[in-house]
């Protein structure tokens, strides 16, 4: 079983002013691609540095999530602190994920350069910051997801299987399990 944490960062959604659709978009995409049994953990919280850190730590250390996806809080606004909170709790930061997501997003919108998305690992958990809009989530996740299952292998997490007709991932031949 793969354990996945989804953390939505939104002051207004956390107050119930509108329904979070970004977290559900992530869940739907992952259910489409991943063939393992999945258990999801889901939180909607305000853009608060300490709250983000504590929830990420809970997803990693207590709930033992293999994958953790954040949505929102990656722009330049004063309250956008998701990347800082992510980096603060990670053992290792993986900047290539953010670099590729920005490159891909620039094909759709020039303001993508304002994004500060990042990724990292804590213990056996992989963490990825995603944008707050469902369309942008898919646009960012598609180019980087092929590397995520092998990254999880390398950090000792559970083996993630995908429907190759929908999402073909990369692993060296020596890392492929039949």
Residues of each region from the PLM?
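Non-catalytic beta/alpha edge segments that cap or flank active sites
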Residues: 1-178
């Amino acid at each position: 079983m793969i354990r996945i944490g989804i953390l939505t960062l939104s002051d207004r959604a956390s107050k119930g002013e509108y329904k979070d659709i970004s977290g559900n978009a992530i869940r739907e995409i992952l259910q489409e691609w991943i063939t393992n049994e999945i258990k999801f953990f889901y939180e909607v919280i305000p853009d608060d540095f300490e709250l983000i850190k504590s929830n990420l730590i809970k997803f990693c250390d207590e709930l033992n999530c293999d994958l953790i996806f954040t949505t929102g809080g990656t722009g330049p606004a004063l309250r956008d602190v998701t990347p800082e909170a992510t980096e603060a709790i990670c053992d290792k930061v993986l900047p290539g994920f953010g670099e590729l997501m920005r490159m891909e997003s620039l094909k759709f919108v020039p303001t993508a350069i304002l994004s500060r998305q990042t990724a990292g690992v804590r213990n056996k958990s992989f963490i990825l910051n995603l944008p707050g809009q469902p369309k942008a989530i898919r646009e960012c996740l598609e180019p980087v997801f092929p590397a995520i299952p092998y990254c999880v292998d390398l950090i000792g997490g559970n083996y993630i299987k995908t429907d190759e007709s929908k999402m073909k991932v990369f692993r060296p031949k020596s890392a492929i399990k039949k």
